[in-house]
Curated annotation (Swiss-Prot):
A Gene Ontology molecular function term of the record: NAD binding
Enzyme class: oxidoreductase
Binding site for substrate: Y228
Protein name per its UniProtKB record: Enoyl-[acyl-carrier-protein] reductase [NADH] 2
Chain coiled-coil ranges: none
Function description: Involved in the final reduction of the elongation cycle of fatty acid synthesis (FAS II). Catalyzes the reduction of a carbon-carbon double bond in an enoyl moiety that is covalently linked to an acyl carrier protein (ACP).
Catalytic machinery residues: Y238
Length: 400
């Protein structure tokens, strides 16, 4: 069978196994040539390891100088007679293959990170492969819902809405290359609460508590989770909306976890990353035009970073091998420093003032935006022959 990209709106319905392999190899090649991570962690647990920042962190820590062994948790779908499976499934497969070639331990646990059974599996894997302790825990779950404990079949569901106001902005339909004006109504208090439950810090803290209780935290263990703040132009839909409330909760959680890990001479940080095309970010209405302008400007200025560049720089220049960890006044590690530089934002704002449905593909980096989205799912790589038929039985044997 031939695997073609299938996009519905902003959702990819297909993934190319060997395109995903190409993506993994490309990221590995980058981190091997980049400034290396020194004094890095050796035993790392990544919650949400199969795409985006979680996957990039895993690649950076394994191949970018630290030579870390990793346990990755993700909720992915394998190939079947009905479909190709998810990109994350193949990312897990090919990451493990490449890591093991270099003698690294790479354990994939495919399961619901919210489920108690998954936690039990993780603790057992730490005992078996890591001599019972971890040096770094990365929390990078991106999901729209979370099961309510002790209420089978009931979920908290996050929403992406402004708070206290109606916001009008544009979304991009990647399927038809269209600009769609959208209006978002204000969230209710209940919607905001649900979003905090799904995307805030409660589950992160619960995981760390589980690891502490299992005596799985090594001396000096750190934990990080990823956040976004953005410039003022994005605040109505992001920082001042339901997502922002959840991220503020995440930031506050980092402080309480920092106190808990102080008992192990460790620390906890929320890491503010730059705006990027990820499976999650393309869902945020009104953020896409900003991304088009930002990509254009940062590429022109030769300071554009994707997930892998961000993660390698984070571990090589901010979190490890430094006399002290540089944080802002709120104890946040800022990886959005290049994005928020005044000269970058001034140029972004100039483009946004002119951008509309007629010219967004010309004055913004729409081609780069869409290609990055396709590459998340294994498409758009020059080195892959997409005309080649793929035998279903071959990919059914690819297990993480």
């Amino acid at each position: 069978m031939r695997i073609e990209p299938i996009i519905q709106g902003v959702v990819a319905r297909s993934a190319h196994p060997f395109g995903c392999e190409a993506a993994i190899k490309k990221q590995i090649a980058f981190v091997k040539k980049a400034p290396q991570i020194s004094q890095g962690p050796k035993r790392v647990l990544i919650l949400g390891a199969s795409s985006g920042f979680g996957l990039a962190a895993r690649i950076a820590l394994t191949f970018g100088g630290a030579q870390a062994d990793t346990i990755g948790v993700s909720f992915e779908r394998g190939p079947s007679e009905k479909g190709t499976g998810s990109a994350g499934w193949y990312n897990n497969v090919f990451f493990k293959r490449e890591a093991e070639k270099e003698g690294r331990i790479a354990i994939n646990i495919v399961g619901d990170a919210f489920a108690s059974e998954t936690r039990t599996q993780v603790i057992e894997a730490i005992e078996t492969y890591f001599e019972g302790e971890v040096d770094l825990v990365i929390y990078s779950l991106a999901t729209g819902m979370r099961p309510i404990p002790n209420q089978p079949g009931e979920f908290w569901r996050s929403v992406i809405k402004p708070f206290g106001q109606t916001v009008t902005g544009a979304s991009l339909d990647l399927e038809h290359d269209r600009w769609i004006d959208t209006t978002l109504e204000s969230a209710t208090e209940e919607e905001a609460l649900h979003t905090i439950k799904v995307m805030g810090g409660e589950d992160w803290e619960s995981w760390i508590d589980t690891l502490i209780n299992a005596e799985s935290i090594a001396q000096g263990c750190q934990t990080i989770a990823f956040s976004y703040v953005g410039p003022e132009i994005t605040h109505p839909i992001y920082l001042d909306g339901t997502l922002g409330r959840a991220k503020i909760d995440l930031h506050q959680t980092s402080h309480s976890l920092n106190l808990k890990l102080a008992n192990f001479d460790g620390a906890a940080y929320a890491t503010v990353c730059k705006a990027l095309v990820t499976k999650a970010s393309v869902f945020i209405p009104a953020l896409s035009p900003y991304l088009l302008a930002l990509y254009r400007v940062m590429k022109d200025e030769k300071c554009h970073e994707g997930c892998i560049e961000q993660m390698q720089r984070l571990f090589a220049t901010k979190l490890y091998g430094q006399d002290h960890i540089s944080v802002d006044g709120e104890r946040l590690v800022r990886m959005d420093d290049w994005e928020l530089a005044p000269h970058i934002q001034n140029k972004v704002n100039q483009i946004l003032e002119e951008m509309d449905a007629n010219n967004f593909q010309v004055i913004g980096d729409y081609q780069g935006f869409k290609n990055e989205f396709l590459q998340l799912n294994g498409f758009g790589f020059d080195e892959v022959d997409y005309s080649q038929d793929i035998d279903l039985q071959t990919i059914l044997k690819l297990t993480p």
